[in-house]
């Protein structure tokens, strides 16, 4: 196992290039199952979740080539191979295989997903959608079994706005008979990205990006070529990092509209944010002041940036309150920040941060992907050296993290853990 070593205190400067969106990639790759011919996806981030999905497509008979941020998928020999165990459980987004395989083969067996440990992430809205389309769904020994004689379009109202359920129902509905209407649909940019791919394959989808999506089923879908949108969460992470310890940082290959809620909060804190066509520049000249943040579904403040933002607010003057309305278990990073000297207490779904505090390097552990990002920011801000374990979580969602940070002047490197350190991590 590896750990990240971070020597903090060096102001960052330069340009960082944003990769393709992880949250799009993990849905676009399963979507290729629905096609009858080759699908090529460009601008893929080089992260472990993408590699894992490529391997899963091979397990069900697909031919997959992955090189230079491009995946070429030939789905013509795929079949409804059950995937109750193994790799499928390592990946939260493996649930998109349910919608895609149900849509293509009218049956699927998928082990319940893993990935980030954020408390219960129920898939009841996904199942409700599949059942409305005519599928029989059972949960047996930690795997979801789906079967349908035929899928028929339906009107589906989501009780909770869910990106995962919106995409999964789209995947299952594009080859169903008749019209499907998803009401109270999520509006995230990644949903538009998936709808764009499916439309290029021949699907008939209207309203993606609004709260009502209409899908008219078609007989078959063909291959296509698609380029993924930039990763708004990676972009936001670097914007927060630049606000915490940057002097003059240019974030390149970004859609500013997708990070509007973050731009507004940074400006409210007193950060100098310059918005260009496909770039954002962060300059840091003055003291930052505390603000209150409440996570909401898009276009509100993203839950995926709540943890990095919490770290930033330790460096702002005054009291800030961060409330996560999406995932109430997303505060595992706070104990680690406290080890570094942060003054934070958790009350229910809120973290109350008293700043400004000087953070000190410490041994800390990332419990999930975005907690890892928040602790990297903390390490770069802190005095001394921070040792960060749980690096595998970061590798799931951030491409070339160290190289991008080194390009900005950060002092960050990897080391192998000792046997004793590995034992400590496994037992904690």
Curated annotation (Swiss-Prot):
Subcellular compartments: Cytoplasm
Keywords: Cell cycle, Cell division, Cell shape, Cell wall biogenesis/degradation, Cytoplasm, Peptidoglycan synthesis, Pyruvate, Transferase
Gene Ontology BP annotations: cell division; cell wall organization; peptidoglycan biosynthetic process; regulation of cell shape; UDP-N-acetylgalactosamine biosynthetic process
Pfam family, one: EPSP_synthase
Pathway as given in its UniProt record: Cell wall biogenesis; peptidoglycan biosynthesis
Active site: 116 (proton donor)
Domain of life: Bacteria
Cellular component annotations (GO), alphabetically ordered: cytoplasm
Catalytic activity: phosphoenolpyruvate + UDP-N-acetyl-alpha-D-glucosamine = UDP-N-acetyl-3-O-(1-carboxyvinyl)-alpha-D-glucosamine + phosphate
CDD domains registered for this protein in UniProt: UdpNAET
Enzyme Commission number: 2.5.1.7
UniProt: UDP-N-acetyl-alpha-D-glucosamine binding residues: 92, 121-125, 304, 326
InterPro entries reported in the protein's UniProt record: Enolpyruvate_Tfrase_dom, Enolpyruvate_Tfrase_sf, MurA_subfamily, RNA3'P_cycl/enolpyr_Trfase_a/b, UDP_GlcNAc_COvinyl_MurA
Main location: cytoplasm
NCBIfam families xref list: murA, PRK09369.1, PRK12830.1
Function field: Cell wall formation. Adds enolpyruvyl to UDP-N-acetylglucosamine.
The protein's name: UDP-N-acetylglucosamine 1-carboxyvinyltransferase 2
Organism encoding this protein: Halalkalibacterium halodurans (strain ATCC BAA-125 / DSM 18197 / FERM 7344 / JCM 9153 / C-125)
């Amino acid at each position: 196992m590896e750990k990240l070593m971070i020597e903090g205190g060096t102001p960052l400067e330069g340009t960082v290039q944003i990769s393709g969106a992880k949250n799009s990639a993990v849905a676009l790759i399963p979507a290729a199952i629905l096609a009858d011919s080759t699908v090529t996806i460009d601008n893929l981030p080089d992260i472990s979740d993408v590699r894992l999905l490529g391997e899963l497509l091979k397990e069900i008979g697909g031919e997959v080539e992955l090189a230079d941020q491009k995946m070429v998928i030939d789905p013509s020999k795929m079949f409804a191979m059950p995937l109750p165990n193994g790799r499928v459980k390592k990946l939260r987004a493996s649930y998109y295989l349910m919608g895609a395989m149900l849509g293509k083969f009218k049956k699927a067996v998928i082990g319940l997903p893993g990935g980030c440990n954020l408390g219960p992430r129920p898939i009841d809205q996904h199942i409700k959608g599949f059942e409305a389309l005519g599928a029989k769904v059972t949960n047996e020994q930690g795997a979801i079994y789906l079967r349908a004689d035929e899928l028929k379009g339906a009107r589906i109202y989501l009780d909770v706005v869910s990106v995962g359920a919106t995409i999964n129902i789209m995947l299952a509905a594009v080859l169903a008979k008749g019209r499907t209407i998803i009401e109270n649909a999520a509006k995230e940019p990644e949903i538009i990205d998936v709808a764009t791919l499916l439309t290029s394959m021949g699907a008939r989808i209207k309203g993606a990006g609004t709260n009502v999506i209409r899908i008219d089923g078609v007989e078959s879908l063909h291959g296509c070529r698609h380029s993924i949108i930039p990763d708004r969460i990676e972009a936001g992470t670097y914007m927060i990092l630049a606000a915490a310890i940057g002097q003059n940082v240019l974030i390149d290959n970004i859609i500013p509209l997708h990070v509007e809620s973050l731009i507004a909060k940074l400006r409210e804190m007193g950060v100098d944010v310059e918005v260009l066509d496909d770039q954002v520049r962060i300059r840091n000249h003055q003291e930052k002041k505390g603000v209150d943040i409440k996570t909401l579904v898009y276009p509100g403040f993203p839950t995926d940036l709540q943890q990095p933002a919490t770290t930033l607010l330790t460096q702002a003057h005054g009291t800030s309150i961060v409330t996560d309305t999406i995932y109430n278990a997303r505060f595992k990073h706070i104990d680690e920040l406290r080890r570094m000297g942060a003054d934070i207490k958790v009350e229910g779904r809120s973290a109350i941060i008293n700043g400004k505090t000087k953070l000190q390097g410490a041994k800390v552990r990332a419990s999930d992907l975005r907690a890892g990002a928040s602790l990297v920011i903390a390490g770069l801000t802190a005095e001394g050296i921070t040792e960060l374990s749980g690096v595998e979580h970061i590798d799931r969602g951030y491409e070339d993290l160290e190289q991008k940070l080194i390009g900005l002047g950060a002092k960050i490197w990897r080391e192998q853990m000792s046997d004793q350190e590995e034992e400590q991590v496994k037992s904690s």
